[in-house]
Amino acid sequence: MPMRIERDLHMATGNGETSYTKNSRIQEKVMFQIKPVLEEATRAAYSALLPQTMVVADLGCSSGPNTLRFVSEVIGIIARHCKEHDRRHDYPQLQFFLNDLPGNDFNNLFLLIQQFNKSMARNHKGEAAEALPPCYISGLPGSFYTRIFPSESVHLFHSLFSVHWHSQASEQLKDTKNKCLDIYITKNMPPSMVKLFQQQFEKDFSLFLKLRYEELVSGGQMVLTFIGRKHEDVFTGESNHLYGLLAQSLKSLVDEGLVEKEKLESFYLPIYSPSVGEVEAIVKQVGLFNMNHVKVFEINWDPYGDSEGDDVHDSIRSGENVAKCLRAVMEPLVASQFGEHILDKLFKEYARRVAKHLENEKTKHAILVLSIEKAIIHV
Protein backbone atom coordinates (compact mmCIF):
# COMPACT_ATOMS: atom_id res chain seq x y z
CA MET A 1 0.00 0.00 0.00
CA PRO A 2 1.58 3.35 -1.02
CA MET A 3 2.59 5.71 1.77
CA ARG A 4 0.13 8.45 2.72
CA ILE A 5 1.37 11.03 5.22
CA GLU A 6 -1.95 11.72 6.96
CA ARG A 7 -2.61 8.02 7.44
CA ASP A 8 0.86 6.60 8.01
CA LEU A 9 2.86 9.33 9.74
CA HIS A 10 2.38 8.56 13.41
CA MET A 11 4.35 6.88 16.14
CA ALA A 12 3.95 3.15 16.91
CA THR A 13 0.72 2.82 18.86
CA GLY A 14 -0.21 1.07 22.10
CA ASN A 15 1.92 0.25 25.12
CA GLY A 16 3.88 -2.76 23.87
CA GLU A 17 7.64 -3.26 23.76
CA THR A 18 7.95 -1.63 20.33
CA SER A 19 5.53 1.23 21.06
CA TYR A 20 6.45 4.90 21.14
CA THR A 21 5.19 5.04 24.72
CA LYS A 22 7.96 2.63 25.75
CA ASN A 23 10.62 4.06 23.44
CA SER A 24 10.55 7.85 23.70
CA ARG A 25 13.44 8.50 26.08
CA ILE A 26 15.35 10.56 23.51
CA GLN A 27 12.41 12.98 23.36
CA GLU A 28 12.27 13.05 27.16
CA LYS A 29 15.96 13.96 27.39
CA VAL A 30 15.56 16.68 24.78
CA MET A 31 12.60 18.16 26.68
CA PHE A 32 14.81 18.39 29.75
CA GLN A 33 17.48 20.23 27.75
CA ILE A 34 15.09 22.82 26.31
CA LYS A 35 13.40 23.65 29.65
CA PRO A 36 15.06 27.09 29.97
CA VAL A 37 13.96 28.06 26.45
CA LEU A 38 10.40 26.87 27.09
CA GLU A 39 10.27 28.71 30.42
CA GLU A 40 11.39 31.99 28.89
CA ALA A 41 8.85 31.72 26.05
CA THR A 42 5.99 30.71 28.35
CA ARG A 43 6.62 33.60 30.73
CA ALA A 44 6.85 36.04 27.81
CA ALA A 45 3.62 34.77 26.25
CA TYR A 46 1.73 35.15 29.52
CA SER A 47 3.27 38.51 30.47
CA ALA A 48 2.44 40.09 27.10
CA LEU A 49 -1.32 40.20 27.75
CA LEU A 50 -1.94 38.64 31.19
CA PRO A 51 -4.89 36.72 29.72
CA GLN A 52 -7.62 35.25 31.92
CA THR A 53 -7.47 32.18 29.69
CA MET A 54 -4.11 31.22 28.21
CA VAL A 55 -4.25 28.93 25.17
CA VAL A 56 -1.31 26.58 24.63
CA ALA A 57 -0.94 24.12 21.74
CA ASP A 58 1.43 21.18 21.37
CA LEU A 59 1.78 20.40 17.66
CA GLY A 60 2.71 16.83 16.75
CA CYS A 61 2.03 15.76 20.33
CA SER A 62 2.08 11.98 19.73
CA SER A 63 0.67 9.83 22.53
CA GLY A 64 3.43 9.04 24.99
CA PRO A 65 4.23 10.34 28.47
CA ASN A 66 6.24 13.28 27.10
CA THR A 67 3.03 14.97 25.97
CA LEU A 68 1.85 15.29 29.55
CA ARG A 69 5.32 16.24 30.74
CA PHE A 70 5.05 19.29 28.51
CA VAL A 71 1.62 20.13 29.96
CA SER A 72 2.94 19.72 33.50
CA GLU A 73 5.97 21.88 32.74
CA VAL A 74 3.86 24.78 31.42
CA ILE A 75 1.52 24.59 34.42
CA GLY A 76 4.52 24.78 36.74
CA ILE A 77 6.05 27.72 34.87
CA ILE A 78 2.84 29.75 35.05
CA ALA A 79 2.37 28.90 38.73
CA ARG A 80 5.91 30.04 39.57
CA HIS A 81 5.57 33.20 37.51
CA CYS A 82 2.32 34.20 39.19
CA LYS A 83 3.68 33.54 42.68
CA GLU A 84 6.81 35.59 41.95
CA HIS A 85 4.66 38.51 40.76
CA ASP A 86 2.09 38.23 43.57
CA ARG A 87 -0.66 36.98 41.25
CA ARG A 88 -1.31 33.64 42.95
CA HIS A 89 -4.93 34.67 43.58
CA ASP A 90 -5.37 35.55 39.93
CA TYR A 91 -4.12 32.51 38.03
CA PRO A 92 -5.14 32.24 34.37
CA GLN A 93 -7.11 29.25 33.20
CA LEU A 94 -4.87 27.11 30.98
CA GLN A 95 -6.41 25.57 27.87
CA PHE A 96 -4.17 22.95 26.25
CA PHE A 97 -4.74 21.62 22.75
CA LEU A 98 -2.83 18.46 21.86
CA ASN A 99 -2.60 18.24 18.09
CA ASP A 100 -1.45 15.46 15.78
CA LEU A 101 -2.47 13.73 12.57
CA PRO A 102 -5.60 11.53 12.68
CA GLY A 103 -3.49 8.35 12.71
CA ASN A 104 -2.08 9.27 16.13
CA ASP A 105 -3.08 7.01 19.02
CA PHE A 106 -5.55 9.47 20.52
CA ASN A 107 -7.27 6.70 22.49
CA ASN A 108 -4.07 6.09 24.41
CA LEU A 109 -3.55 9.84 24.76
CA PHE A 110 -7.00 10.34 26.26
CA LEU A 111 -6.30 7.58 28.80
CA LEU A 112 -3.08 9.36 29.74
CA ILE A 113 -4.97 12.65 30.10
CA GLN A 114 -7.49 10.97 32.40
CA GLN A 115 -4.66 9.58 34.54
CA PHE A 116 -2.95 12.97 34.53
CA ASN A 117 -6.09 14.77 35.73
CA LYS A 118 -6.59 12.23 38.52
CA SER A 119 -2.96 12.57 39.56
CA MET A 120 -3.20 16.36 39.63
CA ALA A 121 -6.33 16.21 41.77
CA ARG A 122 -4.78 13.64 44.12
CA ASN A 123 -1.49 15.48 44.53
CA HIS A 124 -3.19 18.75 45.42
CA LYS A 125 -6.15 17.47 47.41
CA GLY A 126 -6.54 19.46 50.57
CA GLU A 127 -4.14 22.18 49.45
CA ALA A 128 -5.17 25.77 48.95
CA ALA A 129 -7.33 26.34 45.89
CA GLU A 130 -4.66 28.53 44.35
CA ALA A 131 -1.95 25.81 44.47
CA LEU A 132 -1.91 25.49 40.67
CA PRO A 133 -3.67 27.15 37.75
CA PRO A 134 -6.77 25.28 36.54
CA CYS A 135 -6.13 23.45 33.28
CA TYR A 136 -8.30 21.94 30.56
CA ILE A 137 -6.88 19.51 28.00
CA SER A 138 -8.33 18.63 24.60
CA GLY A 139 -7.18 16.53 21.66
CA LEU A 140 -7.12 18.14 18.22
CA PRO A 141 -6.61 15.86 15.20
CA GLY A 142 -5.49 17.50 11.97
CA SER A 143 -2.45 18.59 9.98
CA PHE A 144 -0.58 21.63 11.27
CA TYR A 145 0.11 22.44 7.63
CA THR A 146 -3.46 23.77 7.58
CA ARG A 147 -5.25 26.34 9.75
CA ILE A 148 -6.31 24.58 12.94
CA PHE A 149 -7.13 27.54 15.23
CA PRO A 150 -9.14 30.76 14.95
CA SER A 151 -7.26 33.97 14.21
CA GLU A 152 -5.28 35.43 17.12
CA SER A 153 -6.40 32.79 19.60
CA VAL A 154 -3.21 31.01 20.74
CA HIS A 155 -0.61 32.38 23.16
CA LEU A 156 2.04 29.65 22.96
CA PHE A 157 2.86 27.00 20.36
CA HIS A 158 5.24 24.15 21.07
CA SER A 159 6.43 21.41 18.76
CA LEU A 160 9.02 18.72 19.45
CA PHE A 161 10.44 16.59 16.61
CA SER A 162 7.52 17.29 14.27
CA VAL A 163 8.15 20.27 11.98
CA HIS A 164 11.00 18.49 10.17
CA TRP A 165 8.43 16.06 8.68
CA HIS A 166 7.12 16.83 5.20
CA SER A 167 3.51 17.91 4.76
CA GLN A 168 2.96 15.33 2.04
CA ALA A 169 4.67 12.59 0.09
CA SER A 170 6.45 14.41 -2.72
CA GLU A 171 5.25 13.03 -6.04
CA GLN A 172 8.50 14.15 -7.66
CA LEU A 173 10.56 12.15 -5.17
CA LYS A 174 8.30 9.12 -5.50
CA ASP A 175 8.46 9.25 -9.29
CA THR A 176 12.25 9.58 -9.37
CA LYS A 177 13.82 6.18 -9.95
CA ASN A 178 16.20 5.83 -7.03
CA LYS A 179 18.76 3.41 -8.45
CA CYS A 180 21.02 3.86 -5.41
CA LEU A 181 18.17 2.63 -3.18
CA ASP A 182 18.78 5.48 -0.73
CA ILE A 183 15.88 6.63 1.45
CA TYR A 184 17.46 9.87 2.66
CA ILE A 185 20.18 12.23 1.47
CA THR A 186 23.56 10.65 0.66
CA LYS A 187 26.57 11.69 -1.39
CA ASN A 188 25.51 9.14 -4.01
CA MET A 189 22.11 10.76 -4.48
CA PRO A 190 21.59 12.88 -7.62
CA PRO A 191 21.73 16.63 -6.80
CA SER A 192 18.22 17.02 -8.24
CA MET A 193 16.84 14.65 -5.58
CA VAL A 194 18.73 16.38 -2.78
CA LYS A 195 17.21 19.67 -3.95
CA LEU A 196 13.72 18.16 -3.73
CA PHE A 197 14.24 17.34 -0.04
CA GLN A 198 15.43 20.89 0.63
CA GLN A 199 12.68 22.56 -1.38
CA GLN A 200 9.96 20.53 0.33
CA PHE A 201 11.23 21.60 3.76
CA GLU A 202 11.47 25.25 2.73
CA LYS A 203 7.95 25.17 1.30
CA ASP A 204 6.48 23.39 4.33
CA PHE A 205 8.25 25.44 7.00
CA SER A 206 7.35 28.72 5.29
CA LEU A 207 3.70 27.66 5.19
CA PHE A 208 3.85 26.53 8.82
CA LEU A 209 5.14 29.94 9.95
CA LYS A 210 2.51 31.84 7.97
CA LEU A 211 -0.32 29.72 9.42
CA ARG A 212 0.90 30.07 13.00
CA TYR A 213 1.31 33.83 12.58
CA GLU A 214 -2.40 34.10 11.83
CA GLU A 215 -3.31 32.00 14.87
CA LEU A 216 -1.03 33.65 17.45
CA VAL A 217 -2.11 36.59 19.57
CA SER A 218 0.02 39.73 19.69
CA GLY A 219 3.12 38.84 21.68
CA GLY A 220 2.53 35.13 21.06
CA GLN A 221 5.49 32.77 21.29
CA MET A 222 6.60 29.59 19.56
CA VAL A 223 9.22 27.00 20.61
CA LEU A 224 10.18 24.51 17.89
CA THR A 225 12.65 21.66 18.25
CA PHE A 226 14.00 19.76 15.24
CA ILE A 227 16.38 16.94 14.60
CA GLY A 228 18.83 19.06 12.65
CA ARG A 229 22.47 19.08 11.68
CA LYS A 230 25.54 20.92 12.97
CA HIS A 231 27.00 21.91 9.62
CA GLU A 232 25.64 23.73 6.60
CA ASP A 233 26.88 20.96 4.27
CA VAL A 234 23.76 18.87 3.61
CA PHE A 235 25.86 15.70 3.19
CA THR A 236 27.48 15.82 6.64
CA GLY A 237 24.37 15.61 8.81
CA GLU A 238 24.17 13.06 11.60
CA SER A 239 20.76 12.00 10.27
CA ASN A 240 22.45 10.87 7.06
CA HIS A 241 24.18 8.12 9.06
CA LEU A 242 21.06 7.20 11.03
CA TYR A 243 18.83 6.79 8.00
CA GLY A 244 21.63 5.51 5.79
CA LEU A 245 21.98 2.47 8.05
CA LEU A 246 18.25 1.86 7.70
CA ALA A 247 18.60 2.01 3.92
CA GLN A 248 21.43 -0.52 4.09
CA SER A 249 19.25 -2.80 6.20
CA LEU A 250 16.44 -2.58 3.65
CA LYS A 251 18.90 -3.32 0.84
CA SER A 252 19.98 -6.48 2.67
CA LEU A 253 16.34 -7.63 2.68
CA VAL A 254 16.18 -6.94 -1.05
CA ASP A 255 19.22 -9.20 -1.49
CA GLU A 256 17.44 -11.90 0.51
CA GLY A 257 14.32 -11.58 -1.62
CA LEU A 258 12.19 -10.36 1.29
CA VAL A 259 11.67 -6.86 -0.13
CA GLU A 260 10.91 -6.01 -3.75
CA LYS A 261 13.57 -3.81 -5.28
CA GLU A 262 10.93 -1.72 -7.06
CA LYS A 263 9.30 -0.86 -3.73
CA LEU A 264 12.59 0.32 -2.28
CA GLU A 265 13.32 2.36 -5.41
CA SER A 266 10.13 4.39 -4.82
CA PHE A 267 10.49 4.73 -1.04
CA TYR A 268 12.02 7.66 0.82
CA LEU A 269 11.68 9.16 4.28
CA PRO A 270 9.50 12.32 4.19
CA ILE A 271 11.79 14.17 6.55
CA TYR A 272 14.56 16.77 6.43
CA SER A 273 17.12 17.69 9.09
CA PRO A 274 17.86 21.40 8.62
CA SER A 275 20.85 23.47 9.65
CA VAL A 276 20.63 26.61 11.79
CA GLY A 277 21.41 28.67 8.71
CA GLU A 278 18.54 27.17 6.73
CA VAL A 279 16.04 27.70 9.54
CA GLU A 280 17.17 31.28 10.17
CA ALA A 281 17.00 32.08 6.46
CA ILE A 282 13.41 30.86 6.16
CA VAL A 283 12.28 32.74 9.29
CA LYS A 284 13.85 35.94 7.92
CA GLN A 285 12.43 35.39 4.45
CA VAL A 286 8.89 34.89 5.78
CA GLY A 287 9.37 38.05 7.87
CA LEU A 288 6.60 37.46 10.39
CA PHE A 289 8.58 36.54 13.52
CA ASN A 290 11.35 37.92 15.68
CA MET A 291 13.99 35.41 16.66
CA ASN A 292 14.58 35.10 20.41
CA HIS A 293 16.83 32.08 20.54
CA VAL A 294 18.34 29.48 18.24
CA LYS A 295 21.00 26.92 19.04
CA VAL A 296 22.16 23.37 18.38
CA PHE A 297 23.07 20.85 21.05
CA GLU A 298 23.98 17.18 20.87
CA ILE A 299 22.55 14.06 22.45
CA ASN A 300 23.73 10.47 22.15
CA TRP A 301 22.03 8.18 19.65
CA ASP A 302 21.55 5.67 22.45
CA PRO A 303 18.81 7.06 24.70
CA TYR A 304 20.31 5.19 27.67
CA GLY A 305 23.90 6.11 26.89
CA ASP A 306 24.57 9.13 29.06
CA SER A 307 28.37 9.07 29.01
CA GLU A 308 30.15 12.10 27.56
CA GLY A 309 33.21 10.23 26.29
CA ASP A 310 33.96 9.16 22.74
CA ASP A 311 33.59 5.42 23.37
CA VAL A 312 30.47 3.25 23.44
CA HIS A 313 30.81 0.74 26.28
CA ASP A 314 28.34 -1.84 24.93
CA SER A 315 27.79 -1.33 21.22
CA ILE A 316 25.44 -4.31 20.88
CA ARG A 317 23.11 -3.03 23.60
CA SER A 318 23.33 0.51 22.22
CA GLY A 319 22.49 -0.76 18.74
CA GLU A 320 19.37 -2.45 20.10
CA ASN A 321 18.34 0.71 21.98
CA VAL A 322 18.76 2.90 18.89
CA ALA A 323 16.81 0.41 16.78
CA LYS A 324 13.90 0.38 19.24
CA CYS A 325 13.72 4.17 19.21
CA LEU A 326 13.79 4.42 15.43
CA ARG A 327 11.28 1.60 15.03
CA ALA A 328 8.83 3.41 17.32
CA VAL A 329 8.99 6.38 14.92
CA MET A 330 9.33 4.71 11.51
CA GLU A 331 7.32 1.50 11.88
CA PRO A 332 4.03 2.77 10.37
CA LEU A 333 5.80 4.32 7.36
CA VAL A 334 7.89 1.21 6.69
CA ALA A 335 4.93 -1.14 7.16
CA SER A 336 2.76 0.84 4.74
CA GLN A 337 5.36 0.41 1.98
CA PHE A 338 6.79 -3.06 2.63
CA GLY A 339 4.34 -4.81 4.96
CA GLU A 340 4.43 -5.59 8.67
CA HIS A 341 6.00 -9.01 8.12
CA ILE A 342 9.49 -7.54 7.59
CA LEU A 343 9.60 -5.34 10.70
CA ASP A 344 11.22 -7.70 13.21
CA LYS A 345 13.90 -8.86 10.78
CA LEU A 346 14.53 -5.37 9.45
CA PHE A 347 15.12 -3.74 12.81
CA LYS A 348 17.18 -6.67 14.06
CA GLU A 349 19.45 -6.14 11.06
CA TYR A 350 19.38 -2.39 11.70
CA ALA A 351 20.45 -2.91 15.33
CA ARG A 352 23.38 -5.02 14.13
CA ARG A 353 24.51 -2.35 11.67
CA VAL A 354 24.15 0.46 14.23
CA ALA A 355 26.23 -1.56 16.72
CA LYS A 356 28.97 -2.00 14.13
CA HIS A 357 28.85 1.73 13.32
CA LEU A 358 29.11 2.68 17.01
CA GLU A 359 32.16 0.47 17.45
CA ASN A 360 34.00 2.83 15.12
CA GLU A 361 32.30 6.14 15.84
CA LYS A 362 30.13 7.40 18.67
CA THR A 363 27.51 9.41 16.81
CA LYS A 364 25.12 11.95 18.31
CA HIS A 365 21.89 13.59 17.24
CA ALA A 366 22.15 17.30 16.48
CA ILE A 367 19.13 18.96 18.08
CA LEU A 368 18.07 22.40 16.89
CA VAL A 369 15.84 24.49 19.17
CA LEU A 370 14.23 27.69 17.93
CA SER A 371 12.27 30.26 19.95
CA ILE A 372 10.44 32.99 18.03
CA GLU A 373 7.89 35.71 18.78
CA LYS A 374 5.11 37.04 16.58
CA ALA A 375 6.34 40.27 15.05
CA ILE A 376 4.36 43.49 14.85
CA ILE A 377 3.91 44.20 11.15
CA HIS A 378 3.36 47.85 10.25
CA VAL A 379 1.33 48.16 7.06
Curated annotation (Swiss-Prot):
Pfam families hit by this protein: Methyltransf_7
Keywords: Magnesium, Metal-binding, Methyltransferase, Plant defense, S-adenosyl-L-methionine, Transferase
EC id: 2.1.1.277, 2.1.1.273, 2.1.1.274
Induction / repression: Up-regulated by herbivory and jasmonic acid, but not by salicylic acid.
Entry binding sites for Mg(2+): E265, F267
Function: Methyltransferase involved in the biosynthesis of methyl anthranilate in response to stresses. Utilizes anthranilic acid as substrate. Produces exclusively the O-methyl ester. Can also use benzoic acid as substrate. Low activity with salicylic acid.
Name the UniProt record assigns to this protein: Anthranilate O-methyltransferase 3
Lineage of the organism: Eukaryota, Viridiplantae, Streptophyta, Embryophyta, Tracheophyta
